[in-house]
């Protein structure tokens, strides 16, 4: 994802949030690319990038910070959210939360919603340079949190599951109707309150 969060400001700069969902490049290819090495907090995982882009000179764009938005607030552990795996008997296996596939912003309300592999996340972006995680949701029927969409008023958010991936979609007649769907939440006092699921009943 790469979402324009604010701007251009009086200095002609815009702010973009970026997160990739591919594997981390080898350190031999790019020195600052460090994968999932236990105990190494320099990893490119478990964070998003805040990018500042001068509209008049985009070649001078730069990453201004890479906040660890999935960290445990008490221990500081980078992987503080869903660790991956299923949720118990007859539940979906959900990917680990270490990247965001989609971050959608609602600047006038100072909110962003992230579909972040293993969780749906609500962010306070009133300071665009310093996004803060304010709520997290899980779903035992989701495999990979794929997209987040606000309604026009910014009072609801729909999270969509990518069950099986684009090339292995599992919406066949024999697949479980309880797995993979749209999950609809109301935003109440900056918290996500689950309301319902929606899934197309017709198999592909």
Language-model features: where?
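Feature marking well-ordered beta-strand scaffolds used for ligand recognition
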Residues: 1-204
């Amino acid at each position: 994802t790469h979402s324009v969060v604010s701007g251009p400001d009086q200095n002609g700069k815009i702010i973009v949030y970026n997160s990739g969902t591919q594997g981390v490049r080898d350190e031999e290819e790019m020195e600052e690319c460090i994968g999932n090495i236990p105990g190494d907090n320099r990893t490119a995982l478990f964070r998003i990038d805040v990018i500042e882009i001068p509209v008049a000179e985009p070649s001078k764009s730069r990453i201004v910070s890479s906040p660890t938005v999935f960290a445990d607030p008490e221990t500081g552990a980078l992987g503080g959210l869903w660790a991956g795996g299923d949720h118990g008997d007859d539940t979906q296996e959900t990917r680990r939360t270490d990247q965001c596939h989609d971050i959608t912003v609602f600047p006038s309300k100072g909110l962003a919603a992230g579909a972040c592999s293993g969780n749906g996340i609500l962010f306070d972006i009133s300071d665009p340079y310093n996004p803060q995680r304010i709520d997290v949701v899980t779903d035992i029927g989701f495999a990979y949190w794929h997209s987040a969409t606000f309604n026009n008023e910014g009072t609801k958010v729909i999270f969509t599951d990518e069950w099986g991936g684009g090339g292995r979609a599992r919406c066949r007649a024999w697949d479980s109707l309880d797995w993979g769907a749209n999950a609809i939440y109301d935003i109440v006092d900056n918290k996500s309150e689950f309301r319902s699921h929606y899934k197309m009943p017709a198999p592909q």
